[in-house]
């Protein structure tokens, strides 16, 4: 089972994935029959304007790769649920790629680190099974441990081509004449394509090959590959690269020691960090306990405050009622005070008493006058009737 390169960013895995798709002749066997353009690295690490279409195209590519491994998967469409597409893809890949650390929601986006690592893992599985004929290193920088022979690095003529597995169909150089390809045997052919119909693994178009040459030419500082290798066998460069690789392999010892020292230093730093983390965790535990006590105290005070607020509300209501009653009593008291201070009735009584006193005096005078008149009148004679 292949472990996906989840630690690498998508932009790095995408470049490796495009190269592996070329080795699998993806453009010829998958893109052209389905009227699709060739895959570029940006298709895997950049978000497109339609994420669902991007997910569907990537899923279909994975299905084609799985079909190369003899695994049949149900097709997908733009109307399927993205989570369902991601889940089905992970289930189909679980026997060849370790998908334990790849969640479906990281696949449903249609791009990113996890999806690129998954597709790259499937491509690695295809290459491991199909084993295409490519130039590969059998023991890069090794010291011929199997042979037990120590070769002199200063001898430029030493035969070291046995460190390479070379497919003769892929060994060849371009001549200065456009459209001519020279094989290792020195035979010039009229076309850049080999018997398999490919210029290089995954390339069947001469225009694409020229674009590759221009890209490599710009990376090599403007050297024209066609002019340099015209009519020449580039195995000498492979030999030089092999010598350079062996020279570099000797430096790996010191590098390994430096790396070992760095690992030791990193280990010590990690131990310090772990100790500091434990100390901080203990402090966090103490402060967490204090925070819990403070929260409980705050909760109790909050409850008391709520009860006091209710009591204050009740007392405020009672106070309002008492104020209303006091206001009514004050109004009644003012009315009674006004009524008690009113002297109009007393004035009427006094006036009545004064008028009665005058009438009494008049009556007394009249009575006196009447008595006087009575006493002044002579009594009548007997037997005299006064009519």
Curated annotation (Swiss-Prot):
GO terms for biological process: cilium assembly; intraciliary transport; intraciliary transport involved in cilium assembly; non-motile cilium assembly. Its main location: other. InterPro entries: Intra-flagellar_transport_57. This is Intraflagellar transport protein 57. GO terms for cellular component: 9+2 motile cilium; axoneme; ciliary basal body; ciliary pocket collar; ciliary tip; cilium; Golgi apparatus; intraciliary transport particle B. It comes from the Eukaryota. It holds the Pfam family IFT57. The keyword Cytoplasm applies. The lineage of its organism: Eukaryota, Metamonada, Diplomonadida, Hexamitidae, Giardiinae. Keywords: Cell projection, Cilium, Cilium biogenesis/degradation, Cytoplasm, Cytoskeleton, Flagellum. The keyword Cytoplasm applies. It is found in: Cell projection, Cilium, Flagellum; Cytoplasm, Cytoskeleton, Flagellum axoneme; Cytoplasm, Cytoskeleton, Flagellum basal body. Component of the intraflagellar transport complex B (IFT-B) involved in flagellar assembly. Belongs to the IFT57 family.
């Amino acid at each position: 089972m292949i472990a996906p390169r989840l630690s690498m960013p998508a932009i790095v895995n995408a470049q490796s994935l495009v190269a592996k798709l070329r080795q699998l002749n993806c453009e010829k066997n998958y893109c052209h029959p389905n009227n699709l353009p060739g895959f570029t690295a940006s298709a895997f690490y950049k978000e497109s304007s339609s994420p669902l279409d991007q997910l569907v195209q990537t899923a279909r590519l994975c299905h084609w790769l799985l079909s190369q491994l003899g695994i049949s998967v149900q097709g997908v469409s733009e109307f399927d649920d993205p989570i369902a597409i991601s889940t089905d893809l992970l289930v189909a890949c679980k026997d060849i790629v370790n998908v334990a650390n790849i969640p479906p929601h990281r696949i449903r986006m249609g791009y990113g680190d996890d999806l690129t690592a998954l597709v790259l893992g499937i491509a690695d599985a295809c290459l491991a099974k199909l084993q295409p004929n490519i130039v590969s290193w059998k023991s890069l920088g090794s010291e011929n441990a199997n042979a037990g022979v120590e070769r002199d690095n200063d001898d430029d003529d030493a035969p070291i081509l046995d460190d390479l597995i070379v497919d003769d169909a892929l060994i060849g150089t371009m001549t200065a004449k456009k459209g001519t390809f020279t094989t290792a045997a020195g035979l010039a052919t009229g076309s850049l394509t080999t018997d398999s119909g490919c210029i290089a693994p995954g390339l069947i178009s001469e225009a694409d090959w020229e674009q590759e040459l221009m890209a490599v030419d710009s990376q090599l500082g403007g050297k024209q590959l066609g002019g340099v290798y015209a009519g020449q066998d580039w195995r000498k460069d492979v030999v030089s690269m092999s010598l350079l690789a062996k020279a570099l392999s000797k430096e790996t010892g010191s590098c390994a020691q430096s790396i070992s020292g760095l690992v030791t230093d990193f280990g010590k730093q990690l131990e310090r960090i772990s100790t500091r983390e434990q100390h901080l965790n203990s402090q966090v535990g103490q402060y967490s306990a204090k925070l819990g006590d403070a929260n409980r105290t705050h909760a109790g005070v909050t409850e008391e405050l709520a009860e006091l607020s209710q009591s204050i509300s009740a007392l405020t209501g009672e106070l309002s009622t008492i104020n209303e009653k006091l206001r009514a009593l004050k109004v009644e008291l003012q009315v009674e005070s006004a009524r008690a201070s009113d002297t109009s009735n007393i004035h009427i009584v006094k006036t009545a008493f004064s008028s009665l006193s005058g009438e009494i005096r008049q009556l007394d005078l009249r009575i006196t006058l009447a008595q006087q008149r009575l006493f002044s009148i002579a009594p009548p004679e007997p037997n005299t009737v006064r009519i």
